Design a protein with these regions (language model features):
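Extracellular/periplasmic, surface-exposed regions of secreted and cell-surface proteins
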Residues: 151, 199, 205, 282, ...
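Surface-exposed, extracytoplasmic segments of Gram-negative outer-membrane nutrient-acquisition systems
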Residues: 648-662, 700-724, 758-845, 853, ...
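Short, small/polar-rich motifs associated with maturation and membrane association
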Residues: 1-356, 360-365, 369, 426, ...
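Short aromatic-centered micro-motifs
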Residues: 65, 95, 202, 494, ...
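Acidic, glycine-rich flexible loop segments
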Residues: 380-409
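Detector for glycine-centered tight turns/loop "hinges" at secondary-structure junctions
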Residues: 57, 80, 206, 395-397, ...
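Aromatic-residue-lined binding/catalytic grooves and analogous aromatic/hydrophobic interfacial grooves
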Residues: 208, 852, 992
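Extracellular/lumenal ectodomain signal focusing on beta-strand-rich modules
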Residues: 62, 86, 125, 145, ...
């Protein structure tokens, strides 16, 4: 019996790895004693002891340790420790564990420490999906998961910047990445909605509606994206834009560990607008006035000594029945401008306890985070480009009476105290009862809270106060969000022969509450009060009105959900799900929606032709169909609302506020649906060295919600919200991972992520509601040239609309093609009309997104190099339109006004002359790390690293940076002027485990 047990240990280690936590310490010692006893007659050499840990320094429990070429081996205990008796000199130890790459080491002395690296191509990896988990190889839908070890290194503002470029089909838009108070916009597989939002649902540790700012980057274990409709349909009304599942780190059974993960950082300005210096300004600009100073306004706004640091300390561990993890975090970062700053303090904890002979599991999560923000005004950077560079940096009087078109950009920031205090909290409790080995039920109750208090005080020396003739202006705003979640699930699994079936059913209730209050006053006796004594101001007292407002709203959803997973002999797999959901936002006749989904996969690699293949390890073809919904529009728009109609003065009653019908109700307003189709292939080749996926998808938006004009009467208002439009998105995605070189001392792996996406508005109208087109936001003054984008039936999202450039006349005035017909008649751009406008070539949506990651390891060093880029899209460059022409009514200008654009002497016109290629390729991240071998019992793992972000960018775009331009939503590709500087970031970090 002992002999068979030892053989099982060596040859069936995968089984024992799973069973290892169940063994007691005595059983493990017995195993080692028995194994060495049977082999003692063969090996009479020395005893080797050691520890096996993962890359974070945590012990690996149940790892196989064997002398290569023999059956002499053992497994690690709860602390990751092992002892091998009778180990010959120069023996090679093979260390393996499921999910990790096998390591071979030659002990130096009688003690050894082995660090296992995770296997990125591991097919047995467990991936979190909606309301459950799945083995990676059994997925039937388009799901991509990124583990923390594969995150981009360095400083980030939010979690999605860790995986920017890591997931095909996911666009992370960080237009002001160096502003510590900014966050990213996220889009999955294109934009499809006009009014109900295009952002994905965020789920943190199973809690839908999570906030990515309420989590430290060091606490995240993985980020998983559910991309196709079948994967996301289980979330119903909020799954149409994809679902992002964030899983935080958990404790492990074994020795309690303490870890520290921190870094310091500094930002450098990567690129500045090329404006005229004072001498060039005086020499070139007609009517230029020299005020005697030489001021680089843009440079004056830059905080050259900015500094940031981030510290995270975690305590984790547990026993066979209880695991826990507690972490605390402090983060502070100064922005690239002279006023912005952010301080964050966070606490997060989780636990799980198993009792009653593994029948009862209880667990929970708790987190609290507070962020203190000092905010900036991006408009100052626009002003810094256009302002006379010969003014003093303290000048104020010269700008009085300018109507806000000209002002001192430095004083605009320093003479204003603007910020916010934000509190994030989350708590949930989970209880799971394992009724039978294959039947369980679980209950989750959770609460998420977010409180935000904004304050904005403009000192008496602020430009607005000077022009208005009052002493100070104070404004405060308080917002509170409270979400409650109650969910019940039941799971049943059974196997009959080669048929495995899993059934899940559940109920979900969510309640979303929002409250807002704001107040303002001005003309204070002193600036010392700031926003702390609004009653001291006298402006609102003069006419008896209160300068305050408040609002409150609520939304509720109820859902019944179910899912079936079927697996026939790992050859055929099927998943079907259904969610029936009700939402209070919709009309009385359409409050409930049904969201079905189905997906299937065929493991082609199990065919006889592949049985002896040395190339194909796993090959799977899958197809999915799913219906999801959207509910991201304003609450109560289906109902008749009364709203304020302004203030009216009565000699008898004083000021009276009027109320009346605020909208046209639509009791038939229903669900905006998205129907998704996905065809995919998952592959693992060449002994797991090459792996990845290929997906083709179509997403059709139906009953898209929009605002439509209606006649007066019978309607009281000009517009009504209705389900009319249709949209479509199409594309493909490729992910490929290749372990190119694997030797004892050196490894090289590379991965490519490629996606192609197009989105189109198919139809606006039906027989009842008609809408010819909608225009994007108009361009600002001076000039008010109108909008550069238009959507109508059949046009791609992000289409540009304007005049076709035909050169200039003898006076340098811009000419356009009449009727937009190139080669025909030309006319002055200033005389152009609607009949001369056409759709211009290209859209503001990148069709192609590409990233290329490379990871090298040599002994104790690791190096990662990451490129990413976006291609085949255009940017309407407002910088060139407003500051790159000689006649523009601003003081200073870009050098291009007298160089590339010197031939243009007339005013700006929205035409394709200013429509530029937005393509770029960026060396986005280089990280060099060192993990020294330490012969100490106090430190289990130490890693030092340095990261540089935004190393260089290759682009033809002449604006500040193509990444500052929004490429998500309905109106992408407008290169605005309120642009925050882009940074080149340098980070030094330390990761220690004790």
């Amino acid at each position: 019996m002992k002999k068979n047990f030892v053989n099982l240990t060596m040859r069936g280690g995968g089984i024992l790895c799973l069973l290892a936590p169940m063994f007691s310490a005595n059983a493990e010692n017995s195993l080692r004693t028995d194994a060495s006893f049977n082999l003692s007659s063969v090996y009479q050499d020395e005893r080797i002891s050691g520890t096996v840990v993962d890359q974070e320094g945590n012990p690996v429990i149940g790892a196989n340790v064997i002398i290569k070429g023999t059956q002499n081996g053992t497994i690690t205990d709860l602390d990751g420790k092992f002892i091998l008796e009778n180990c010959p000199a120069n023996a090679i130890l093979q260390v393996s564990y499921i999910g990790y790459q096998t390591q071979e080491v030659v002990p130096e002395g009688t003690s050894v420490k082995v660090t296992l690296r995770e296997d990125s191509q591991n097919l047995e990896e467990v991936v979190v999906v909606g309301y459950g988990s799945s083995v990676k190889k059994d997925l039937t839908t388009a799901v991509t998961s990124v583990k923390s070890k594969d995150f981009l290194q360095g400083a980030v503002n939010d979690a999605m910047q860790l995986v920017d470029g890591k997931v095909a089909g996911v666009t992370v838009n960080s237009t002001a990445a160096s502003d510590p108070n900014s966050s990213s916009s996220i889009q999955v597989r294109g934009a499809s909605s006009l009014k109900a939002g295009n952002s994905p649902l965020i789920v943190i540790d199973g809690m839908p509606g999570g906030d990515l700012r309420n989590i430290a980057q060091q606490d995240i274990e993985s980020i998983t994206v559910l991309k196709d409709g079948s994967a996301a349909a289980i979330y119903g009304s909020r799954g149409a834009n994809g679902v992002i599942l964030v899983t935080t780190k958990q404790g492990r059974a074994g020795k309690t560990t303490i870890s520290y993960d921190g870094y310091v950082e500094h930002d450098f300005v990567a690129n500045k607008p090329d404006v005229l210096d004072p001498d060039a300004y005086l020499a070139n600009v007609t009517g230029a006035v020299d005020h005697g100073y030489r001021t680089d306004w843009y440079d004056e706004l830059i905080n050259k000594n900015n500094f940031g640091h981030n510290h995270n300390i975690a305590l984790a561990g547990g026993s066979e029945s209880t695991i826990f993890r507690i972490s605390t975090n402090f983060k502070q970062k100064e922005g690239l401008d002279i006023v912005s700053k952010r301080k964050e303090y966070g606490l997060r904890g989780n636990f799980k306890h198993i009792t009653l002979e593994d029948r009862l599991e209880v667990g929970g999560n708790i987190s609290y985070r507070i962020a203190d923000e000092d905010c900036t005004d991006y408009g100052s950077f626009k002003q810094a480009v256009q302002l006379n560079p010969t003014y003093s940096v303290d000048e104020m009087e010269a700008f009085q009476g300018s109507g806000g078109y000209s002002y001192n950009p430095v004083k605009n920031l320093t003479e204003r105290d603007r910020g916010a205090l934000q509190e994030y909290s989350m708590v949930d409790f989970n209880i799971k009862l394992n009724i039978l080995d294959n039947l369980n039920t679980e209950l989750k109750l959770g609460r998420q809270g977010h409180n935000k208090k904004e304050q904005d005080y403009k000192y008496s020396t602020f430009r607005e106060c000077i022009d208005g003739g009052y002493h100070g202006h104070a404004y405060i705003k308080q917002e509170n969000w409270t979400d409650w979640t109650l969910e019940w699930l039941g799971n049943y699994e059974f196997t009959i022969g080669k048929h495995n079936t899993k059934i899940m059913g559940g109920y979900s209730y969510q309640e979303f509450n929002y409250e807002e209050f704001d107040a303002e006053n001005r003309n204070f006796p002193t600036d010392a009060f700031l926003t702390n004594n609004l009653g001291a101001g006298d402006y609102q007292k003069l006419d008896g009105r209160l300068g305050m407002n408040s609002t409150k709203n609520q939304e509720k959803t109820i859902a019944f959900l179910g899912r079936v997973n079927y697996n026939y002999n790992d050859l055929f797999l099927f998943t079907g799900s259904l969610r029936y959901e009700g939402n209070t936002k919709f009309g009385a006749d359409n409050k409930w929606g049904l969201f079905p989904a189905a997906s299937a996969a065929w493991r082609v690699s199990k065919l006889p032709v592949f049985e002896s293949s040395s190339v194909v390890d796993d090959l799977k073809v899958r197809f999915s169909y799913g219906v999801t919904g959207r509910s991201g529009f304003d609450k109560y728009i289906s109902l008749a609302k009364y709203t304020g109609y302004g203030d009216y003065y009565s000699d008898r009653f004083g000021w009276i506020k009027g109320y009346g019908p605020g909208n046209n109700p639509n009791y038939d307003l229903g669900w905006e649906k998205q129907v998704s189709y996905n065809l995919g292939i998952d592959y693992t080749l060449f002994k797991s060295r090459l792996s990845g996926s290929l997906d083709l998808f179509i997403r059709d938006g139906r009953d898209v919600i929009g605002d439509y004009k209606v006649p007066l009467p019978p309607y009281l208002h000009e517009t009504i919200t209705a389900n009319v439009g249709t949209t479509t998105s199409k594309g493909f995605e490729l992910q490929a991972n290749w372990d190119a070189v694997q030797t004892k001392d050196f490894t090289y792996s590379t991965n490519v992520v490629l996606s192609y996406t197009t989105s189109k508005l198919k139809s606006f109208s039906n027989e009842k509601y008609q809408l010819g087109y909608i225009d994007g936001d108009g361009f600002p003054s001076p000039g008010n040239p109108g909008s550069a984008q238009r959507l109508q039936d059949g046009t791609p999202i992000g289409s540009f609309y304007g005049f076709k450039y035909a050169g200039v006349d003898e006076n340098g005035q811009i000419l356009i093609w009449e009727g937009g017909k190139e080669g025909g008649t030309t006319k002055l751009g200033a005389d152009g009309n609607e009949q001369d406008k056409v759709y211009l070539d290209g859209t503001g949506v990148p069709k192609w997104e590409l990233s290329w990651g490379n990871t090298f390891t040599y002994k104790n060093f690791d190096l990662s190099i990451f490129f990413r880029g976006r291609f085949d899209y255009k940017i309407m460059n407002q910088y060139e339109m407003y500051y790159g022409l000689q006649v523009i009514a601003v003081d200073n200008k870009l050098t291009s006004a007298y160089e590339e654009n010197a031939h243009i002497k007339g005013p700006k016109v929205i035409c394709d002359y200013f429509l530029q290629n937005g393509n770029y390729l960026r060396l986005d991240n280089i990280t060099l790390g060192w993990t020294p071998k330490l012969n100490t019992k106090w430190i289990s793992n130490l890693r030092l690293y340095a990261t540089i972000k935004n190393v260089f960018t290759l682009t033809k775009y002449t604006g500040v940076d193509p990444t500052t331009v929004t490429t998500t939503g309905l109106w992408p590709g407008i290169g605005g002027m309120d642009v925050y500087p882009t940074a080149r970031n340098l980070t030094f970090g330390v990761q220690i485990s004790y």
